[in-house]
């Protein structure tokens, strides 16, 4: 059975660099045999604001929570807005508080690959750091490689969504591989312990 890698990333702008970066990293996991689901900008923009005092959930909210619940790994991409995570991405992450009572709480035991796109290196670095802090707080394992892409430096993607920057494409492929490799190893470790 193939592993499920869930991608969360995008903006309200169709074809945003953060959405395309997450798609590129997910494609690398697919090439190595993973199944993927991507929650992009349009989907994320339609989610209601997370309100912990309101337990009712829309079908879209339930779909996101259930996908992350079933995920063997995640790839999260955010634009760097004013040095931090976009509200769209943070709202989706906040919704995952619904996983607090699960046997596998939040991101527990899962690798989380992180991608940041911004029009400048400062926002890239601060946003990546913020995302790593969030993943740690949610008991996830940020991958060793976090990808930051400066959209002011070069054209990152072609009109068809193909990554135009070779170095960026290589980094996104490596990120996807790290997430999937961790999922494979983590799944094998409990089986080895049970067999011992």
Q: Model-found features: residue ranges?
A:
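Short, flexible active-site-adjacent loop segments at beta-strand->alpha-helix junctions, enriched
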Residues: 80, 118, 153
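Short alpha-helical linear motifs
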Residues: 112-114, 134, 153-154, 189-196
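Short, glycine-/small-residue-rich phosphate/pyrophosphate-handling segment
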Residues: 108-150, 167
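N-terminal beta1-alpha1-beta2 submodule of the flavodoxin-like/Rossmannoid cofactor-binding fold
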Residues: 1-102, 162-196
